[in-house]
């Protein structure tokens, strides 16, 4: 069974991200190859992984509507002093 990929894109970042993440950074999670393309700090990864896993496996996740009309999930990094927002979407 072929699974989907999930793309995480930084859509907002304020202050100083200690990991150096910037708006536009992308990470692809591929369940077929078990590979991750790109980089994501451990703090953002551990907090976003349940939502990423649910998206990849057809789980129920709260969605927002992106500018292109597609459904996306949003996730906030746990660093409250330097907020970073990820947009999570399924890619083929």
Describe the function of each predicted region.
Residues 1-8:
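Short, basic/aromatic beta-hairpin or loop at an interaction surface
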Residues 4, 61-92:
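Short, compact, well-ordered microdomains
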Residues 11-16:
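Short alpha-helix capping/helix-loop boundary micro-motifs
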Residues 34-44:
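Short, Lys/Arg- and Gly-enriched loop/turn segments at beta-strand edges
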Residues 46-67:
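Short peripheral tails and domain-boundary helices/loops at the edges of structured domains
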């Amino acid at each position: 069974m072929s699974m989907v990929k999930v793309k995480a894109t930084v859509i907002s970042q304020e202050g100083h991200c200690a990991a150096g993440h910037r708006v536009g950074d992308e990470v692809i999670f591929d369940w077929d190859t078990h590979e991750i393309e790109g980089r994501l700090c451990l703090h953002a990864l551990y907090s976003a992984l349940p939502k990423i896993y649910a998206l990849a496996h057809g789980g129920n996740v709260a969605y927002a509507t992106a500018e292109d009309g597609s459904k996306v999930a949003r996730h906030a990094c746990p660093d409250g002093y330097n907020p970073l927002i990820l947009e999570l979407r399924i890619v083929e």
